[in-house]
C-alpha cells in the first residue's frame, strides 16, 4: 500500500523515490521467499460461483493433450483485479497452471498489490501481466519475479466494429466525458473549466455508468446546478456500447479528467470512433505514448479551459482511427501477445504449435471476431474451437473448499459487485 500511495501522490520527487526503492527492495525479498509469498497468497476462500467470472475469464488457447496428459499448455485470460483474485482463491491453481499459461489484465494501476503479487507464489510457471502504465511495467521488471509484464492493456482491445466513425454526424457537443459517478473521475475539474470559459454556448455530453458502490452521483449533479451549468451539460446514463459510439461521434473531443486509474478504455474507444482524446500529462495508468499528433493532446491541469476551446475550433485536424487500427486494434494486440507467449514458451522449453485467438473488451471479454448473428455471447467459439467455458473451468478446477464455501458466498457477491472496477 505504501508503494502504491507514493507512486500516486509524488511519483518524481527524490524523497519519494528513496522510499519507493526501500519498499521495492522489501518486496523483492518477499517475492524471492516462498514463506513471504505464502503469507501474501493466504486468503479466505470464497464460493466458486460461475456468475462471478463470466465476462472476466476467457480461454484464448486450448491445451493440447496426448490421451490424459497435457503436452502443450493453453492460455487463460483473467480480467479485473478483484475477479482474478477471486479466481486464484477459488481454484486449484497448481492444476490450472499445469494446463494453462495465465494472462492477467488488472483493472487498476499500482501493481504493488497483494492481489497481483500473490500470483508470484506459483514458482514453477510464469504469469503474464498486462502493464500499460510504464511505472507498473518497470516495477514488475525490477521485481525480477515470475510476473512477466507486457506493455498492453484495456486500451488495446477496443472493438473497432462497435466504435467507429458514423456518416456525417452532427457535432452537437464541444466535448464528451465518459465517467462513472465516482470522485476519482474528477468531474469538478470540467465544471470549473466551463465556469471559467463562461460561454453558455459551449456544450458537453456527460456519459455515465451507474455502478453499485459509486455514491457521488447526487453530489456531481448538485455541483452542475450550483455552477448553473444544467443547460450546457447533457447527461446520458447506462448506454449500450453502440449508443456510446453515437454520442462520441457527436463530440469534438473526448476528455479524461482523472489523475490515476487503470488503463482506461473510453479514451481509446473515442480514437476508434474518430474522436481525439484529451488527458493530463501526469496521469498514472493510461499509456501516454498512445497520444500522438493524430490522436489528441496531453496537457497540464491548468491548461484545461484553453485546451477545450482549442478542440472546439480545431478538432478536424485530428484523425485518430487510422493510428488506432494500425497500433491497438484487437488483431494487432493479439499478435503482440501471441509473440510474447511464444517466446515465453521457448524460454521454458515448452512446445508452441497453436497460436491464441483474438479477443476484445465490450466491456467484458468477448472473442473477436465473434459470431455475427450472436455478437453478445461471451462464450461463442471462433472458428469452431471448442474452448472451455467458465462453467467448465469452475467444474474442473474449483477447490473442494470453494465448492462448499457458503458462509462467504453472500459476502463475496456483495464485495465483488461493489468493489470491482467494470473495465
Task: Annotate each predicted stretch with a short phrase.
Residues 312-370:
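A charged, aromatic-enriched C-terminal amphipathic alpha-helix characteristic of glycosyltransferases
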Residues 246-251:
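Short alpha-helical donor nucleotide-sugar binding micro-motif in glycosyltransferases
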Residues 259:
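Aromatic "clamp/platform" in nucleotide-sugar-dependent glycosyltransferases that forms part
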Residues 217-239:
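Nucleotide-activated donor-binding/catalytic signature segment of Leloir-type glycosyltransferases, i.e.
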Residues 270, 276-282:
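Short hydrophobic beta-strand element within catalytic cores of glycosyltransferases
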Residues 1-100, 335, 411, 417-423:
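N-terminal pre-catalytic "stem/leader" segment of glycosyltransferase-like enzymes
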Residues 163-185, 191-196, 204-205:
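Conserved donor-binding/catalytic core segment of Leloir-type glycosyltransferases
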Amino acid at each position: 500500500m505504501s508503494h502504491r500511495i507514493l507512486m500516486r501522490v509524488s511519483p518524481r520527487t527524490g524523497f519519494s523515490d528513496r522510499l519507493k526503492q526501500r519498499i521495492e527492495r522489501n518486496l523483492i525479498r518477499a517475492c524471492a521467499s516462498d514463506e513471504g509469498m505464502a503469507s501474501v497468497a493466504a486468503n479466505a476462500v470464497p464460493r466458486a460461483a460461475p456468475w462471478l467470472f463470466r465476462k472476466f475469464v476467457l480461454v484464448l488457447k486450448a491445451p493440447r493433450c496426448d490421451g490424459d496428459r497435457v503436452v502443450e499448455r493453453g492460455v487463460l485470460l483473467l480480467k479485473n483485479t478483484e475477479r482474478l483474485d477471486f479466481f486464484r482463491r477459488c481454484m486449484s491453481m497448481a492444476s490450472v497452471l499445469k494446463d494453462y499459461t495465465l494472462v492477467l489484465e488488472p483493472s487498476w494501476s499500482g501493481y504493488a498489490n497483494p492481489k497481483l503479487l500473490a500470483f508470484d507464489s506459483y514458482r514453477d510457471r510464469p504469469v503474464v501481466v498486462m502493464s500499460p502504465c510504464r511505472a507498473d511495467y518497470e516495477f514488475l521488471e525490477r521485481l525480477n519475479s515470475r510476473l512477466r509484464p507486457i506493455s498492453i492493456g484495456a486500451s488495446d482491445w477496443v472493438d473497432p466494429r462497435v466504435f467507429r466513425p458514423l456518416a456525417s454526424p452532427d457535432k452537437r457537443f464541444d466535448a464528451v466525458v465518459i465517467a462513472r459517478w465516482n470522485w476519482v473521475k474528477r468531474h469538478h475539474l470540467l465544471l470549473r473549466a466551463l465556469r471559467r470559459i463562461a460561454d453558455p454556448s459551449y456544450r458537453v455530453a456527460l456519459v455515465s455508468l451507474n455502478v453499485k458502490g459509486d455514491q457521488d452521483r447526487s453530489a456531481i449533479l448538485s455541483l452542475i446546478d450550483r455552477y448553473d451549468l444544467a443547460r450546457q451539460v447533457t447527461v446520458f446514463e447506462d448506454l449500450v456500447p453502440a449508443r456510446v459510439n453515437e454520442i462520441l461521434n457527436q463530440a469534438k473531443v473526448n476528455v479524461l479528467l482523472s489523475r490515476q486509474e487503470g488503463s482506461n478504455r473510453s479514451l481509446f474507444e473515442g480514437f476508434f470512433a474518430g474522436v481525439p482524446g484529451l488527458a493530463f500529462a501526469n496521469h498514472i495508468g493510461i499509456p501516454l505514448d498512445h497520444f500522438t499528433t493524430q490522436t489528441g493532446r496531453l496537457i497540464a491541469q491548468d491548461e484545461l479551459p484553453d485546451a477545450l476551446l482549442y478542440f472546439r475550433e480545431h478538432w478536424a485536424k485530428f484523425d485518430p482511427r487510422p493510428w488506432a487500427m494500425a497500433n491497438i486494434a484487437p488483431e494487432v494486440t493479439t499478435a503482440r501477445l501471441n509473440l510474447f507467449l511464444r517466446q515465453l514458451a521457448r524460454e521454458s522449453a515448452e512446445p508452441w504449435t497453436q497460436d491464441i485467438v483474438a479477443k476484445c473488451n465490450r466491456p467484458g471479454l468477448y472473442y473477436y471476431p465473434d459470431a455475427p448473428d450472436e455478437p453478445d455471447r461471451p462464450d461463442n467459439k471462433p472458428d469452431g474451437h471448442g474452448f472451455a467455458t467458465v462453467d467448465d473451468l469452475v467444474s474442473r478446477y474449483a477447490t473442494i473448499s470453494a465448492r462448499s464455501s457458503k458462509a462467504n458466498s453472500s459476502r463475496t457477491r456483495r464485495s465483488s459487485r461493489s468493489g470491482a472496477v467494470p473495465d
